[in-house]
Amino acid sequence: MGLTIQVGAADQVLEEDFAKVLVAVLAASFPGAGAEPREEDTWYSPELGWSGWGALQERVERVLGAGAAPHFLSMEAWFGAYLPVATEPGVLQVGDDETPFSIAALSALTEELERFGRAANLPTDREGLTRLADKYEDDDLCDDDMDLQTYAQVLLGALVARERRQPLWIIK
């Protein structure tokens, strides 16, 4: 199973019962988090190789230095969201779920990835990111540069999430 980055309401991305509880927790702790139901379609990336997230985190840390991207580096590619509100990286306990739900700020993620992109001489605009992502749709290249594929899709998703004021979901 790979990783798909998503932007949308909680009820479009998560199981219904969990989504209801999470929306209530987010509304109480982070007004304006954008997880409530909406009519907009969910934006989602193509399925990415699971190894790309960790490879990108390693590359970001190598290029920017230790501690330079705390929001991006705080999130495992498992169970969390970048929220369109000011917050520090952390975890929430949601209902009776044993797995803590990771959160970080969408604006900080976007800034960190754009700074990384500039430092690594990669595109940071939607058009350039789309071209970079499209390059890897070729069957001969689909297993190459998992970190770059992940970078393009995460930053594209972050730009969409910022525009919509919705969370960027990192959910297995």
Language-model-detected regions and their locations in the chain:
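Acidic (Asp/Glu-rich) sequence patches and key acidic residues
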Residues: 1-164, 171-172
